[in-house]
């Protein structure tokens, strides 16, 4: 485990790409222990000058879309191109069972064994915001360790897609063709943040369905307002199982990066993502401090009970809580 005495040496080893040190650094960053948090802050501050040159990708898709098969085929393609690949799997655990929704890395056997690849799951335990914060910090560790491409994976449920879209350069929505109702299976909000839509499982007897789905998605994307002036989102097809179409996806990602880099938009997006991340973390930290105050916590619970019992309107409850905070902290 990394400690105060070994921090400088651990940073050196991390910069050299040592996998064991990277895993230890991730464990440190994930820890909620106050001493570990202070140490991980020093670690993250120290590696920031070495971050920013990595291509950040997000991949989402509903269960059954073949994400693990796709990521294995895609990751192995990148490795053959001479690149180092890290996969961070943000896992919004089931709110009912607490179990994992994402498959584990044993479904990516070849990629998991590859020396040029690193796979790390990030379970959320029902709190996606915390998981996305950790994923962002783990992504920075991978960048400092010299990985050329970092892929953040999540399932297409809840707010997981938009959370991931806010931390990556290029966001890919993995879909499968159905019986003509494909657009019902992808939310408008997701289409608005997707830079590429990839229809997987273009194999067997599914070619006609895939062609129909591709046309539907392309038509819908042309109606929606573009996310970037520099880029018209593309719809591509592939068979991850047969490893067909994977190289075309990589070429499209390169086209995307080239277009946004040339205009300066990519740098602007990353800067805005950092600002939004700081704002969100500030809000969470302020709330944590508020609820650590026993007087506020008690008053909040009383207000909440009154709102539940319809003896107080939510607007009045908000005003009273605001006045309480003003009195306690600002007067």
Curated annotation (Swiss-Prot):
It is an enzyme of class 3 (hydrolase). GO terms for cellular component: cytoplasm. ATP binds at residues 61-68. GO terms for molecular function: ATP binding; GTP binding; GTPase activity. Keywords: ATP-binding, GTP-binding, Hydrolase, Nucleotide-binding. It comes from the Bacteria. It catalyses: GTP + H2O = GDP + phosphate + H(+). Binds and hydrolyzes GTP. Likely functions as a G-protein chaperone that assists AdoCbl cofactor delivery to the methylmalonyl-CoA mutase (MCM) ScpA and reactivation of the enzyme during catalysis. This is GTPase ArgK.
